[in-house]
C-alpha cells in the first residue's frame, strides 16, 4: 500500500475520532430566551408524574410493566417532558405522605427508590423524553421542609390534615432561617446530583434524559418580614449555585408557583429569578385552590378562571421577557364536573380549560415566544381506584393526586378520552408549527 494512501486513511480515522469526541449530549439549554436542543422542541406540552421513581422500583409500590405502558402512552400522545419527584423524605406510614420514601433519615436512603429513578430515566431516554427532577417540597406530602426541621431538632413535623394549614405554614416558615435544616438539605442535593445511574452507568450530570434540576415543589417563604424573605432568596440562590457547581450541564429551575407562592409579592419573585444560576421561570395555576371556581361554579365561573389565568401568565411573561428567560407553566389542574372523583365522570369544564391553556402555548410556538412549556397536573394514566378509600392508602395504585388529596381530584386517566384528544390536538399543533 502506498505511503500516501496509508497517511490518508490515518488522517480520515483521526478526523472521525475527533468528530465523535466533539459530539455533545443533547442537553437542553437557554439561548436568547428559548429552549435549545439538537433533538428536542423549543415548546412543549408535558405532565406531572410525581410517582415515576416509585413505579420504576423493584420494591414496594414498584410496577415496571405499568411504568413502561405509561411512558409509551405519554410518548404516543406527544408528551416528552415529565415533572418527577426525586423521592420523599422521612419514615413511611405517616398520614398524607407518599410512601415508600427515598430518604429515611438524613443521608440514609432506600436504594430501591433510587434504582427506580435510575430505571425511569433509562426508559425515558429510550423514548427521547426528559425529566424535570424536583428535590424538595414546601408541603407535607413528601416530607420536605417539615421533615428537615424535625431532623434539625426543631420539633415534630406537623400534618395539615391534623392541625390545619395555618399552623402548618407557620411551622415550616422556620425552614429558611434554620441553618442546620438547610445544611441537611444541601447534603441531600450533593448526594442526588452526584449520583451515577445503576442502569446505564452514566452519571446524572452526563444524562441528557434530565431536562432540569428543580430546587423544590412550590418553594415558599411563608413569611412577609424582610429577614425571612432575604433568607428565602439566599436559600434559593445558594441551592441553585450548589447544583450548578456539581452539574454544569443541566439547567436549574426554582419550582415556584409565581407571585402566588411569593406572598403575592412580584418583587420577591423577581429577586429569586434574577439569579444567574436559575435558567428559566416557573408558574403554577390552580383555579379551584385559589377560589376562582368552587365546587358548584366549575362551569359558571370557568370564564373567570380563564381570564385570571391569562392575566397571571401575562404578568409573569412580562418579567420573563425582561430577563430573557423562558416561562413554563409546570402545574395546573381543574376538577371533574360537579366535583366528582370517579373515573368515567364528565370532564367538560376541565377540557375547555385545558384547551384554552394549550392554545396559549401553540400561539407562543407560532410567535417564537418565551411562553415555552406546560405540564398539567397530573397524570393518572392506567391507575385503578379504590372502591373504599377516598384518600390513598398503602397498596392503592398511584395516580396524579398525592396522598393528601382525594384520589381522582385532578388526575387525568387514559379513560378520559375527550381529554386525550385535547392533549393530542395540542401536541400535534405544536409539532406542525415547529416543522415550519
Explain the meaning of each model-derived region.
Residues 1-10:
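Bacterial N-terminal signal peptides that target proteins for export
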Residues 296:
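Amphipathic helical hotspot of TIR/SEFIR-family domains
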Residues 3, 19-21, 212:
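Intrinsically disordered, low-complexity regions enriched for glutamine and histidine
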Residues 12-27:
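Bacterial Sec-dependent signal peptides at the C-terminal "C-region" and cleavage site
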Residues 25-292, 301-326, 332-352, 356-359, ...:
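Active-site mouth of glycoside hydrolases
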